[in-house]
Structures are given as C-alpha cells and as structure tokens.
C-alpha cells in the first residue's frame, strides 16, 4: 500500500526550506484543510488551484507529484 501524497510530501519538510518543494511541504503541513488522504492528481490539483495561495506556481506541485509517482505509485 502506498502513502497518500500529503504523507509523502511531509518527508520534504525543513525548518528553513532549501527549495520550493520544501516550502510547499511546510505550507501543506500548516494547511488544516489540505486533503491529507488524497492520492489522485485531479483532486489535489483542483484543491491547490482553487483553495490555496501559498504555491508560487502549479509547477511546484507538478514536480512534487512526479516524484510521488516515481517513488510511491511506481508509474
């Protein structure tokens, strides 16, 4: 069984983020409405596009999603 995207993303959290994915992980951690159990691209991208303002660009999510697919979903 694979981790949800949120739980996968948490491995990138850093007190002082070194990159955009670490900053994204920190913001997602602080976002109490983040869909923590979601593992579908459409659900997550819709939430991020419509409900948050902490991502500088959706390309940050796309990069994190590609890593998630490779590591967890083995696509």
Regions found by a protein language model. Name each.
Residues 12-13, 28-32, 47-51, 64-68:
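Generic structural signal for hydrophobic core residues of well-folded globular domains
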Residues 37-66:
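Short, charged early-sequence alpha-helical segments and their helix-coil boundaries
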Residues 1-24:
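N-terminal acidic leader/helix
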Residues 14-18, 34, 54:
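Alpha-helix boundary/capping and short turn/kink residues
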Residues 20-37:
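A short, compositionally biased N-terminal segment around positions ~18-40 that is enriched
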Residues 71-75:
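Short acidic DE-rich linear segments
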Residues 1-2, 35-39:
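Short acidic alpha-helix initiation/capping motifs at coil-to-helix transition points
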């Amino acid at each position: 069984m694979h981790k949800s995207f949120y739980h996968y993303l948490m491995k990138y959290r850093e007190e002082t983020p070194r990159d955009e994915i670490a900053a994204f992980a920190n913001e997602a951690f602080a976002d109490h409405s983040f869909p923590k159990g979601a593992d579908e691209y459409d659900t997550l991208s819709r939430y991020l596009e419509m409900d948050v303002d902490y991502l500088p660009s959706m390309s940050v999510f796309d990069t994190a999603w590609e890593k998630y697919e490779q590591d967890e979903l083995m696509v």
